[in-house]
């Protein structure tokens, strides 16, 4: 009797640790996976191409060009200049323009996803990871998840990272433009 019970228990333990084979993947968050796939189908082809964003205000000038490829890679260039308002002899003047170290060309990867990378509410993200092409710049050009609004034939609407419009969004325009400064 004891032998039968032990044999039965061992058989149950062996069955519990044996895997059932399935060709279907198991997702930790099926909803996020399905919405990510839908997001990529709907907007992935629209994002592929070259986009630019230009912002010129009194104390800073910013230009960025991003070229997204359908293999999930992208290249970019950024030009960023600032100047300070100083008082000389009681009068305010701007200093000359200084190019920030964050300027330069970079290469990396991109992806669209639906998730909550920082906790909280899930939403659509454009994930960007890129290193500067200049090896002397020892930091990333991008390593972030930007909230993704939409893309169409003319506009890529994403949360601004370095620079943005007053509403917090950056509206990149399609096309291969050059910096005006």
What do the predicted segments below correspond to?
Residues 6-12:
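Sec-dependent N-terminal signal peptides
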Residues 4-5, 67:
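Residue-level detector of intrinsically disordered/flexible regions characterized by low predicted structural confidence
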Residues 21-109, 115-181:
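Lipid interaction determinants
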Residues 16-19:
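C-terminal motif of bacterial Sec signal peptides marking the signal peptidase cleavage site
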Residues 1-4, 110:
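Positively charged n-region of N-terminal signal peptides that target proteins for export
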């Amino acid at each position: 009797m004891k032998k039968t019970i032990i044999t039965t228990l061992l058989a149950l333990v062996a069955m519990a640790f044996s895997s059932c084979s399935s060709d279907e993947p198991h997702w930790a968050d099926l909803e996020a996976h399905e919405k990510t796939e839908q997001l990529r189908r709907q907007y992935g082809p629209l994002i592929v191409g070259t986009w630019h964003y230009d912002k010129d205000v009194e104390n800073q000038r910013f230009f960025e060009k991003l070229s997204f490829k359908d293999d999930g890679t992208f290249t970019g260039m950024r030009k960023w200049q600032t100047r300070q308002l100083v008082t000389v002899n009681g009068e305010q003047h701007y200093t000359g323009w200084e190019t920030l170290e964050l300027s330069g060309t970079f290469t990396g990867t991109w992806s669209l996803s639906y998730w909550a990378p920082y906790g909280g509410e899930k939403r659509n993200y454009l994930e960007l990871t890129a290193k500067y092409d200049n090896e002397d710049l020892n930091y990333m050009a991008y390593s972030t998840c930007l909230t993704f609004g939409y893309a169409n034939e003319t506009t890529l609407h994403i949360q601004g990272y370095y620079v943005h419009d007053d509403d917090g969004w950056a509206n990149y325009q399609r096309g291969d433009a050059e910096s005006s400064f």
